[in-house]
């Protein structure tokens, strides 16, 4: 279980993309937690996955999650906002693995007949901005949006298990959060000089 399954490239948000070690246990635990506790993927579902399989969102949250529960998956080499809803209808995809910009592109498309009564009821991913969340959920009638936050090489992550709007959810890790002043580019402190 602790054996190395593969190396996966990080997104590069904290610097140059790098290869991160992925043990087998992390694949199993990650995909199982996402499917069962997160967006409740089952063998009756078909997932739309247009993300690269060399990144953890497309591979772990997408393909491995489907394998974990015996769900089908429609893998698209390249995302196209104009053909998305037609493909969703054609392949009856009930789940969608995303990064936030895909949701923005879909929201900026003119309404089309295929988006009405679309079968997508659940989605999982990262980067869906709060200012777009309600618009996306309401326009496309998505029941469960499971936003996650974590790094490929991290030991844990945040997950929106309770399907609350505009949140990355919770974690089971013992962590502390601090207030950050973006304008001053530093942590906020109280009158005693302690971090808030």
State where each predicted segment sits:
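Short beta-strand->loop structural element characteristic of the AMP-binding/adenylate-forming
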Residues: 18-21, 49, 71-78, 146
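Conserved AMP-binding A3 loop
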Residues: 5-29
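Conserved pre-ATP/AMP-binding loop-to-beta segment of ANL
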Residues: 1-9, 16, 39-46
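Alpha-helix capping/helix-boundary segments
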Residues: 80, 102-103
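Conserved ATP/PPi-binding loop(s) of AMP-dependent carboxylate-activating enzymes
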Residues: 182-196
């Amino acid at each position: 279980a602790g054996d190395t399954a593969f190396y996966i490239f990080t997104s590069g948000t904290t610097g140059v993309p790098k290869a991160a070690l992925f043990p087998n246990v992390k694949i199993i635990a990650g995909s199982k937690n996402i499917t069962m506790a997160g967006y409740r993927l089952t063998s009756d579902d078909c997932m739309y996955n247009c993300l690269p399989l060399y990144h953890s969102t497309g591979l772990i949250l997408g393909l491995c999650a489907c394998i974990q529960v015996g769900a089908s998956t429609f893998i698209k080499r390249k995302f196209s906002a104009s053909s998305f809803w037609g493909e969703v209808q054609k392949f009856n995809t009930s789940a969608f693995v995303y990064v936030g910009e895909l949701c923005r592109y879909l929201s900026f498309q003119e309404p089309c007949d295929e988006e009405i009564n679309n079968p997508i009821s659940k989605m999982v991913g990262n980067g869906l901005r709060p200012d777009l969340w309600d618009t996306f959920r309401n326009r496309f009638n998505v029941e469960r949006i499971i936003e996650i936050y974590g790094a490929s090489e991290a030991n844990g992550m945040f997950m929106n298990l309770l399907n609350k709007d505009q949140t990355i959810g919770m974690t089971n890790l013992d962590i502390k959060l601090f207030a950050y002043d973006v304008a001053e580019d530093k942590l906020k402190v109280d009158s005693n000089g302690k971090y808030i």
